[in-house]
């Protein structure tokens, strides 16, 4: 914010979400709308039964456009991960270190996401996780995962 703006305006600007945001299109709109309701939906092909993520118009297995959105269990395991200790990009450096992971949902699809709610050194491949949601702006909610409670 410019030096001449009010202290209140400067503080409001500092609280704005600074990370890149996803581009929401027709194929992904249902996914992001569900996230705003704190629900994790994934696509399933009605023709062949293939679950898929990322959202898209055609099934990668059979090329059918006959798709439905299905509520996921929100549970899965850490497929692989990395711990980021250094990132100078705005919005990221304040959260260091953070865990970026592929989570394999019980439905069989993998999402690139963050693991939260535990120390980075506690994350392990195969670790059971469950979904949680981060309302980063009034218009955007990100799905994240935390260690599963038995």
Task: Annotate each language-model stretch with its function.
Residues 13, 108, 112-150:
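Well-ordered alpha/beta subsegment
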Residues 39-42, 56:
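Residues immediately within or flanking Cys/His clusters that coordinate Zn2+
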